[in-house]
Swiss-Prot record:
Cofactor(s) for this UniProt protein: Zn(2+)
PANTHER family per the UniProt record, alphabetical: CYSTEINE--TRNA LIGASE, CYTOPLASMIC, CYSTEINYL-TRNA SYNTHETASE
Protein name per the record: Cysteine--tRNA ligase
Classification of source organism: Bacteria, Bacillati, Cyanobacteriota, Cyanophyceae, Synechococcales
A Pfam family annotated for this UniProt entry: DALR_2
Gene3D superfamilies on file: Cysteine-tRNA ligase, C-terminal anti-codon recognition domain, HUPs
Gene name in the database record: cysS
Organism of derivation: Synechocystis sp. (strain ATCC 27184 / PCC 6803 / Kazusa)
Catalyzed chemical reaction(s): tRNA(Cys) + L-cysteine + ATP = L-cysteinyl-tRNA(Cys) + AMP + diphosphate
Gene Ontology cellular-component terms listed: cytoplasm
Amino acid sequence: MTLRLYDSLTRAKQPLQPLHPGLVTMYCCGITVYDYCHLGHARTCITWDLVRRYLQWSGYEVRYVQNFTDIDDKILKRAVDESSTMEAVSEKFIAAYFEDMEALGVQPADLYPRATHTLDGIKRLIAELEAKGYAYPSGGDVYYSVRNFDGYGKLSGRRLEDLQAGASGRVTVADPDGAQKQDPFDFALWKSAKPGEPAWESPWGKGRPGWHIECSAMVREFLGETIDLHVGGNDLIFPHHENEIAQSEAVTGQPLAQYWLHNGMVKVDGEKMSKSLGNFTTIRALLKTVDPMAIRLLVLQGHYRKPLDFTETAIAAATNGWHTLREGLQFGYDYGGDFGWELAFTPLGPDANQWTVAFQEAVDDDFNFAGGLAVMFELAKHLRSEGNKLKFEGSTPADLDLLQTQWITLVSLAEILGLSINPESQSSNDNGLTDGDIEQLVAQRTQARKDKNWAEGDRLRDVLQEAGITLVDKPGGLTEWFR
């Protein structure tokens, strides 16, 4: 069966046909780093981690990029509130992000570009839009002219004539930039510098980029003009992803992405999660009382495009479900030695047996992981039952070779979904450095180099190298690292 996925642009399931056979390029709109991650972030990050893992199991190489927005009004406000800086706030919450994702078993992306590290590409894209007549400077800002792009609204299904901007098309008082726009629907690509805020030189004067242009530039810089999968939460469809399409396709004349995939939002007891309602929960707070594997299972049990209602009943059911799977996964470690089983094995591929085939048939239908889980629960319950016979009766009449195949199959399928009875770090090494630790050390080294404190920069480089981390210094002060 061919993998079919629901494309938000065509509003239909489409067969996956990557631009380059065997390779899937994938971009996810990441977080704005001004606070700790919450349940909505957990749902999004786990969802696309699952998709990436499944594609890899299906034989694809996946090149996965997820950005950090580290220039934003919310970050600046947090910095002011804490008497800190935008850079310090960003570093703090980027490190916290990696800690949270490691706990949830989310594998690191191949690259985490930041807005502040992509400024040259951002300015280059804005200049091209201006040259082609899609952007115009006004009062030190630069705006995108929405009406000049014929395809605007094709992702969200919205038409400009159906949208309202204040009364009778007039700009509302809530839009402080309205007086500088040629049209109420235009949006900022570059914002002029304000007193006390970080700013960068540009052809239009000192300032900082708008939010939407950042992702368009990062996709282009790190993956190319057209990618296979552009993914994110469905709250980003309009205006963010709509604006990305307008920006990128106006310059290239090519589709920004072959497929647009969006996950549903998280609700808490049927209500939208928000701080004002008092139902806002961070990942780290939740992990104090809930097994991270139960959280992954909760995400798996609902279809990724549907809303996920987080309730005590739902998390209890996920916890119970995880206990069942865990008992099945433990079977071979508890009894395999007595049977002479080899406990170290190569995980099974898609066509290994009837259960892997059934799993693939389910998940190939628009990432129906719940259907795949049904196969796993069937195996887990059977293994648990056989384990009870061995525990209480001392023997089982079951075919031991078949039991071994069933156990290896369950372990293999669980690995695809990032479910582990020993949920060790997916992103730490023998030296104990997590991705968050590495990001902090790299940031400290970058600052030392900016301060011309070469001795400290060299010391931090040596610390990282001793931990097995390779640093690659790029133009513009960007440093990439690899294990």
